[in-house]
Curated annotation (Swiss-Prot):
PANTHER family: ACETYL-COENZYME A CARBOXYLASE CARBOXYL TRANSFERASE SUBUNIT BETA, CHLOROPLASTIC. It catalyses: N(6)-carboxybiotinyl-L-lysyl-[protein] + acetyl-CoA = N(6)-biotinyl-L-lysyl-[protein] + malonyl-CoA. Component of the acetyl coenzyme A carboxylase (ACC) complex. Biotin carboxylase (BC) catalyzes the carboxylation of biotin on its carrier protein (BCCP) and then the CO(2) group is transferred by the transcarboxylase to acetyl-CoA to form malonyl-CoA. It comes from Roseiflexus sp. (strain RS-1). Its cofactor is Zn(2+). The gene is accD1. Keywords: ATP-binding, Cytoplasm, Fatty acid biosynthesis, Fatty acid metabolism, Lipid biosynthesis, Lipid metabolism, Metal-binding, Nucleotide-binding, Transferase, Zinc, Zinc-finger. This is Acetyl-coenzyme A carboxylase carboxyl transferase subunit beta 1. One of its GO terms (cellular component) is acetyl-CoA carboxylase complex. GO terms for biological process: fatty acid biosynthetic process; malonyl-CoA biosynthetic process. Its EC number is 2.1.3.15. Pathway: Lipid metabolism; malonyl-CoA biosynthesis; malonyl-CoA from acetyl-CoA: step 1/1.
């Protein structure tokens, strides 16, 4: 998937078939319009349907934004533990951690790294939604705080890619305190004169939105991404009113001044390159620029 974001999106044909079983690995059915799309064409189009629906990418697929050979991962072994011995009628947290690690091949829901986009160095944090809903627990928060500290020390911008259900309920207060810890680390990044660019992808909710993503210098969202604190159904049940059809979508947030831009996936790498270049050039004219270390990448 390393070339995912370097391919020119292609036009593709789709067949509208209702309630038909889909052979494994041959076709993808769009959850939005119901069209069947040939898998290879769907991948060539960055997993975006012709109707505009953006299918969720894995954390590893998002790493395709980076230049070839620039990815250097941090803290891959850092993992959450079941400190509270959490058990609910639906699941045992310790077993859920084991299953998520087997399913995703990751130790937790966040990958952190250094890398480059069009030759411009940066630090990156990207969530894996398939790992317990991309929820922020103690290991997630620690990984994120560490990569922010690395970015501040190395005078590098930070890009976060966020698809999350929020703080991890199985870790209780241990998860909630990560919100404050991460935002404190971001004050160091700001003091170093470096930007935090947050990309919100579907879905982005709860403590992840309420902490570090909502205070980013630039907030970008993919088209149609659902973004909010509490879910739509919870709000409707609480206020006993129907919400607008497009409530909590990226477009709704843009119209109400909550985010800076809505960017299709095919344009994302170019937009990020432009933003990184603007911030780099602005930083070069500050007095802090003389303290920037000469790096090829951030050391782990």
């Amino acid at each position: 998937m390393k070339d995912l974001f370097r391919r020119a999106p292609k036009r593709f044909t789709a067949a509208r078939i209702e309630n038909q079983a889909i052979p494994d690995n041959m076709w993808v059915k769009c959850p939005s319009c119901g069209d069947l799309i040939y898998t290879r064409q769907f991948s060539d189009n960055l997993k975006v349907c012709k109707c505009g629906y953006h299918m969720r990418l894995t954390a590893r697929e998002w790493l395709g934004l980076l230049d070839d050979g620039s990815f250097v991962e941090f803290d891959a072994a850092l993992a959450s533990v079941d400190a509270l011995g959490f058990v609910s009628p639906r699941h045992v947290y310790e077993q859920k951690l084991i299953e998520s690690r087997q399913q995703t091949g990751l130790n937790d829901a966040l990958i952190t790294s250094s890398g480059a986009i069009n030759g411009m160095l940066l630090c990156l944090a990207v969530t894996e939604f398939e790992f317990i809903g991309g929820s922020m627990g103690s290991a997630y928060g620690e990984r994120l705080a560490r990569v922010i500290e690395r970015a501040a020390d190395a005078r590098l911008p930070l890009l976060t890619i966020n698809a999350s259900g929020g703080a991890r309920q199985e870790e209780g207060t241990l998860a909630l305190l990560q919100m404050a810890k991460v935002n404190m680390a971001l004050t160091r990044l700001a003091a170093a004169g470096q930007p935090h660019i947050a990309l919100l992808v579907d879905p982005c909710y709860g403590g992840v939105l309420a902490s570090y993503t909502s205070v980013a210098d630039v907030i970008i969202a993919e088209p149609g991404a659902r973004v909010g604190f509490a879910g739509r159904r919870v709000i409707e049940q609480t206020i006993r009113q129907k919400l607008p059809v497009h409530f909590q979508t990226a477009e709704f947030l843009l119209d109400h001044g909550m985010i800076d831009m809505v960017t299709p996936r095919s344009e994302l790498r170019g937009v990020l390159s432009t933003l990184l270049r603007l911030y780099r050039d602005a930083f070069a004219h500050t007095s802090a620029a003389q303290h920037v270390p000469a790096l090829t990448h951030v050391q782990g």
